[in-house]
Curated annotation (Swiss-Prot):
Protein name: Glyoxylate/hydroxypyruvate reductase A
Catalytic activity: glycolate + NADP(+) = glyoxylate + NADPH + H(+); (R)-glycerate + NAD(+) = 3-hydroxypyruvate + NADH + H(+); (R)-glycerate + NADP(+) = 3-hydroxypyruvate + NADPH + H(+)
NCBIfam families for the chain: PRK15469.1
Entry keyword set: Cytoplasm, NAD, NADP, Oxidoreductase
Keyword Lipoprotein: no
Encoding gene (name): ghrA
GO MF annotation terms: glyoxylate reductase (NADPH) activity; hydroxypyruvate reductase (NADH) activity; hydroxypyruvate reductase (NADPH) activity; NAD binding
PANTHER family linked to this entry: 2-HACID_DH_C DOMAIN-CONTAINING PROTEIN, D-ISOMER SPECIFIC 2-HYDROXYACID DEHYDROGENASE NAD-BINDING DOMAIN-CONTAINING PROTEIN
Pfam families reported in the protein's UniProt record: 2-Hacid_dh_C
Chief location: cytoplasm
Active site: 227, 275 (proton donor)
Length: 312
């Protein structure tokens, strides 16, 4: 079994060694320009077109929680990957716990009004504020996949009213489920904290815009943990300036690194991190990939395959 690996920033030698230990019958190599030798599987992140084009692979693994980086390149270069070759994304591999940590900490930060107390501290003002109640602090999760389910599960323990919005109805205990555009308004109008975990598809690009934000209660919060292209940044800033939104926490941006001239850097009610909410944890990724390859070789059912038509 031949496996090729490509990632622009990961330590390729470590991955090659770890994969060969996990799959003793495999020969793993780092792909380099000009390598046209046969391979059975490819592990990639933002691969050059020539790496995959024309190859008769059994499967491709995207080294991230989504396959959108490859799918977007396929739109421009359909010859890059034959439609018959399955594409897999990393299922959880430690990302679920990281998303739980991030989401819970930020919801509690807003719920306990730490953002307000930081603003008072900057003014040297000693001023206890009225508490929020859980009943008025409904959390809505856009995107009900593996990570959305993990975040909902972690927030349940804190007693917040929970709701989710997705393509298909969910039956998660203690979570109200809303489906499709026809139920989006009902989902939004009682959502105090909006958490975005949507996949990156043609239908979701720019979805967090002025029309959507206007349907949230006054003084709502937005937490974007999915993709920067989901947010119309000018609309978000306008909603913050008008008071429609009380705060935003952003981990992802339409352009990364975020340009120095972006007004997001300087807005007092925008907090941000540099796309670190849930990073690939190598050991857990190796475990998932090696297990899935073994199942594929045995003809067993597997999970994590990207539906190219849906985009996730």
């Amino acid at each position: 079994m031949e496996i090729i690996f490509y990632h622009p920033t990961f330590n390729a030698a470590w991955w090659v060694n770890a994969l060969e230990k996990a799959l003793p019958h495999a020969r793993v190599r780092e792909w380099k320009v000009g390598d046209n030798n046969p391979a059975d599987y490819a592990l990639v992140w933002q691969p050059p077109v020539e790496m995959l084009a024309g190859r008769r692979l059994k499967a491709v693994f995207a080294l991230g929680a989504g396959g959108d980086a490859i799918l977007s390149k396929l739109n421009a270069h359909p010859e890059m990957l034959d439609a018959s070759i399955p594409l897999f994304r990393l299922e959880d591999t430690g990302m679920g716990l990281q998303m739980q940590e991030y989401a819970v900490s930020q919801v509690l930060h807003w719920f306990r009004r730490f953002d307000d107390y930081q603003a008072l501290k900057n003014q040297a003002l000693w001023k206890p504020l009225p508490e929020y109640t859980r009943e008025e602090f409904s959390v809505g999760i856009m995107g009900a996949g593996v990570l959305g389910a993990k975040v909902a599960e972690s927030l349940q323990a804190w007693g917040f009213p929970l709701r989710c919005w997705s393509r298909s109805r969910k039956s998660w205990p203690g979570v109200e489920s809303y489906v499709g555009r026809e139920e989006l308004h009902a989902f939004l109008n009682q959502t105090r904290v909006l958490i975005n975990l949507l996949p990156n598809t043609a239908q979701t690009v720019g979805i967090i815009n002025s029309e959507l934000l206007d349907q949230l209660p006054d003084g709502a919060y937005v937490l974007n943990l999915a993709r920067g292209v989901h947010v119309q940044e000018a609309d978000l800033l306008a909603a913050l300036d008008s008071g429609k939104l009380k705060g935003a926490m952003l981990d992802v941006f339409s352009q990364e690194p975020l340009p120095q001239e972006s007004p997001l850097w300087r807005h007092p009610r925008v907090a941000m991190t540099p796309h670190i909410a849930a990073v690939t944890r190598p050991a857990e990724a190796i475990d998932y990939i090696s297990r899935t390859i073994t199942q594929l070789e045995k003809g067993e059912p597997v999970t994590g395959q990207v539906d190219r038509a849906r985009g996730y």
